């Protein structure tokens, strides 16, 4: 098969595509990754073949200009069932309007979509796998007749709320069923002589790495896939000190890569964080950029500062991990059975943190509730209470039972033959 993977230019979203891309390659299939120019270095670093499309989006810069009001729309993005009573029609309509205008249409610009369609016309993929917000892949598949599927990297909050929104619209008179996302995609497809249907936002099926207990079920056909840690965003080198067992419980502290390269700031001042961990009887490994390290005047004796360290090697040596709520860190800790304290502050990070706490595999602390005292208390719990390690082990077992990327390839071959 020829498989085209499309992803907008955010490295953390692309990282979740890499293990399956390589499983397809090692099974003998041709794989081509299309992304905006800013993504190409990450694609090449993964050893994959890249095709630049469109121009770089300016989503982060736009958010900085729009201001805190738009960010606040995401800040309480709690999609647990107990909160669905607040997700009424007007809220969902407003949310989709904002997301379409300020996110979906920005990371899927006309130039990007045109280039992906032209690429697909020339290369003729059998299957298009698209990151779930990169609708350019679905458009290209529709125009060229390829099979296509969403390659999820997070719980499917988008589709679950989309389904809820559509069910509310269906109860309205025909003249009041405004669907901003559908209208934008319909006008886009019309440029190529095609029209919109819901398959453009759902894919023909979805590939989902979320385990039971974290996964959000929808009406969409789904192929489960095991999460495989990938460290390709940073130098993946094991330092000498990591080859020796720690002398006391080790705590990993990581605030992720996205805050280093975008307008998403850290959720806690580094000085406050170090004040908390300095009082704990633990060895702390904190991953901070050189710029962040330079801003810290005093480093506690029990803290080791590093710029980069492969998490899938570090975390098995740790009693717990304190992190920002990002998908890669969360999933790596979950796959390795490490208890986690997540400082999630928006959208899927909040959901994952709360579900992990509900499973007993970790604790959640929303950034709006974050104080040194609360952080200190939760760290003491997650380090001292053995139940977190036990429940984290159960989450690891659930993830290990899912099919590996290699095991998923035959299913993709079958579905492509049926749908393409």
Over which residues does each language-model region extend?
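Phosphate/nucleotide-donor binding subsite
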Residues: 54-123
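A donor-sugar binding/catalytic signature common to diverse glycosyltransferases
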Residues: 21, 306-355
């Amino acid at each position: 098969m020829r498989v085209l993977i499309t992803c907008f230019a955010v490295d953390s979203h692309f990282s979740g595509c890499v293990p399956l891309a390589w499983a397809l390659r090692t099974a003998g299939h041709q794989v081509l990754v299309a992304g905006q120019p800013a993504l190409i270095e990450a694609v090449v670093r993964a050893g994959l073949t890249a095709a630049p499309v469109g121009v770089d989006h300016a989503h982060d810069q736009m958010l900085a200009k729009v201001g805190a009001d738009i960010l606040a729309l995401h800040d309480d993005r709690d999609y647990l069932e107990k909160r669905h009573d607040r997700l009424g029609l007007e809220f969902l309509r407003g949310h989709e309007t904002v997301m379409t205008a300020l996110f979906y249409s920005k990371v899927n610009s006309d130039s990007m979509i045109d280039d992906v369609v032209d690429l697909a016309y020339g290369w003729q993929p059998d299957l298009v796998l698209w990151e779930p917000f990169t609708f350019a892949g679905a458009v290209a598949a529709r125009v060229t007749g390829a099979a296509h599927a969403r390659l999820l990297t997070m719980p499917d909050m988008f589709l679950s709320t989309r389904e809820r929104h559509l069910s509310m619209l269906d109860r309205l008179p025909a003249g009041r069923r405004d669907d901003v996302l559908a209208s934008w995609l319909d006008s886009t497809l019309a440029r190529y002589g095609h029209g919109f249907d819901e398959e453009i936002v759902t894919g023909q099926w979805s590939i989902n790495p979320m385990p039971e207990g974290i996964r959000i079920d929808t009406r969409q056909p789904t192929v489960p896939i095991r999460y495989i840690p990938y460290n390709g965003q940073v130098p993946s080198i094991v330092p000498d000190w990591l080859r020796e067992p720690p002398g006391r419980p080790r705590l990993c502290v990581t605030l992720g890569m996205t805050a280093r390269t975008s307008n998403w700031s850290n959720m806690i001042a580094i000085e406050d964080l170090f004040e908390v961990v300095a009082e704990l009887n633990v060895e702390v490994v904190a991953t901070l950029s050189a710029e962040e390290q330079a801003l810290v005047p005093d480093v506690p004796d029990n803290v080791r500062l590093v710029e980069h360290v492969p998490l899938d090697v570090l975390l098995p040596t740790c009693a717990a991990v304190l992190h920002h709520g990002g998908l890669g860190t969360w999933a790596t800790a979950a796959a390795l059975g490490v208890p986690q304290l997540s400082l999630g502050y928006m959208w899927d990070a909040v959901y994952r943190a709360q579900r992990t706490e509900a499973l007993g595999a970790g604790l959640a602390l929303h950034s709006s509730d974050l104080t040194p005292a609360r952080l200190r208390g939760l760290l003491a719990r997650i380090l001292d209470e053995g139940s977190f390690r036990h429940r984290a082990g159960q989450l690891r077992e659930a993830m290990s039972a899912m099919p590996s990327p290699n095991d998923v390839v035959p299913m993709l071959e079958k579905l492509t033959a049926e749908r393409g």
